[in-house]
Regions:
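Intrinsic-disorder/low-complexity, polar/charged segments enriched in Ser/Thr/Lys/Arg/Asp/Glu/Gln
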Residues: 3-7, 63-65
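Alpha-helical protein-protein interaction elements
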Residues: 8-9, 16, 75, 80
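Compact, glycine-rich, soluble single-domain proteins
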Residues: 9-52, 56
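C-terminal structural segments of small proteins and small subunits
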Residues: 55-91
Length: 91
């Protein structure tokens, strides 16, 4: 089991709001055996918690750190980074 992390810039207009958080949580839920944590300004939330992610208050231009622990952590982290880098598929 390995643990990897990456710093990611929030690029979508509304930041980590309800819909974006739900997409993130849905992606995490599909990751068998992964433990995902998201951190902003020393505050952390479980990657599987919509409310926890929203409480981080990550807005456009903010930087968050995603940490993934699991047997396929690098691939799973890349998938989450891509989701954020593409603005959660929003305009």
């Amino acid at each position: 089991m390995s643990k990897v992390s990456a710093q990611v810039l929030i690029v979508n207009k509304r930041g980590l709001h309800a819909r974006a958080s739900a997409k993130f949580v849905g992606t995490v839920a599909a990751m068998q055996g992964a433990n995902v944590q998201v951190t902003k300004d020393r505050h952390s939330a479980a990657g599987g918690s919509i409310l926890g992610l929203m409480m981080l208050g990550a807005a456009k231009g903010d930087e968050i750190t995603i940490s993934v622990e699991g047997s396929d952590a690098e691939t799973q982290l890349a998938e989450l980074v891509a989701l954020i880098d593409t603005g959660f598929g929003e305009d």
